[in-house]
Every structure is written in structure tokens, then in C-alpha cells.
């Protein structure tokens, strides 16, 4: 998955996830942010990735699996843990937000 990274907006009542493509030493936005639980971020992200046929299926699956991990962590642990603990749990992703 080194071609892509998740950007996570860590909020008290929601989590938002976007995907960036890694280009050189930086990133380029690939999707907008999708929110959970306000909307079904996973389903929306899946549809967005499927609309980009140039993304390999294995990359789509890996991105969706990682999205599931982040959403589950937020649901189960997020309200008890700070943004810095979430960053420590998922160091390969880009986090911003509150708490």
C-alpha cells in the first residue's frame, strides 16, 4: 500500500477518512473525506475506489481493510483515547483533529 495513505480526521463524534496518493516525497488527494458514523464512510470509499479502475484490486482491498481497522479502533477505543494515541496505533497514516 506504499502508493497510498489514509488521511484521518479524528473528532469526538465522527471520524473522517480520505485517501491520498503518495507522489515523490509528498501526497496528492485522491478522494474527499468520508465520514463515519454520520454516513457510511466504508461504503462510500469502496464506491469511490471502484470508480478508479487504475487502482489495483489488491490496493483497493488493502485500503478498505485499513479503513475498517481505523473505524473499528475509533468506535471501540477512540472516545477513550487521544489523537496522539491513535497516531501511535497507526503511524503509517496522516492524522489531524481534536483531543
Swiss-Prot record:
It comes from the Eukaryota. One of its GO terms (biological process) is translation. Belongs to the chloroplast-specific ribosomal protein cS23 family. Pfam families: PSRP-3_Ycf65. Signal peptide: none annotated. It is found in: Plastid, Chloroplast. The keyword Ribosomal protein applies. Probably a ribosomal protein or a ribosome-associated protein. GO terms for cellular component: chloroplast; ribonucleoprotein complex; ribosome. Part of the 30S ribosomal subunit. Keywords: Chloroplast, Plastid, Ribonucleoprotein, Ribosomal protein. GO terms for molecular function: structural constituent of ribosome. Its main location: plastid. InterPro entries: PSRP-3/Ycf65_sf, Ribosomal_PSRP3/Ycf65. This is Small ribosomal subunit protein cS23.
